[in-house]
Amino acid sequence: MGYTVADMFNLFQFNEGLNGLEVCRQTGMKPTQMQFAKAENVLTKKTNEQMVRRFGEGWNSIENLRRYQEKKNIILNDFDGERMKELRQREDGTIKDYANALGIGHTRLSSMESGVSTFNSWKEYLKFKEFYKDDLLKESAKKEKDEKVVTKEFITFKNIGGHWEMGKRVKREVV
């Protein structure tokens, strides 16, 4: 799967928690430059240099784009608003109190709890995760660590009837 320039910018913005204008402001890029790059699927040398100067060489590397995509997929597919609601109700908190503490509107928090909307960025998710002291993901999304079984073979020598024979001992360990 290849990434378009629009995908690269959108995934990067999602990961960093920035909108297009904030990226332009921080890099010194004109908003029309970014719009052109997204619309025409062309990343000019100047645009790339401005992004590299501010965000580093790897801002659009394949590894980072895949990581950004994984994070976005976690938010889109595995986020559980009902869990947020349960945690809030367990603490006897109101939506308005939690919204004020998180710095968002109570209607947005309510729509997140009902599953209508999700997080705008990965950084916002991390903020909520820290506030709720829970990962806020569906139970089916949590991967349990697979037990790895390592098989070790040892060569042994046995004295059988006055002469030595070679044998093997197999030992399995859970790591």
How would you label these PLM feature ranges?
Residues S61-L76, K138-T156:
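Short amphipathic recognition helices of helix-turn-helix/homeodomain-type DNA-binding modules
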Residues G17-F36, D92-S111:
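Short alpha-helical DNA-recognition segment
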Residues Q13, C24, V52, R88, ...:
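The alpha-helix within a helix-turn-helix
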Residues N10, L21, E49, K85, ...:
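Residues within the helices of the helix-turn-helix
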Residues E86-G93, A141, E147-V175:
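Interfacial/linker helices and their anchor residues that mediate assembly or domain coupling
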Residues K45-E63, T118-E139:
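DNA major-groove recognition helix of helix-turn-helix/homeodomain DNA-binding modules
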Residues M1-E16, R67-R90:
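A short, Lys/Arg-rich alpha-helix, primarily the initiator
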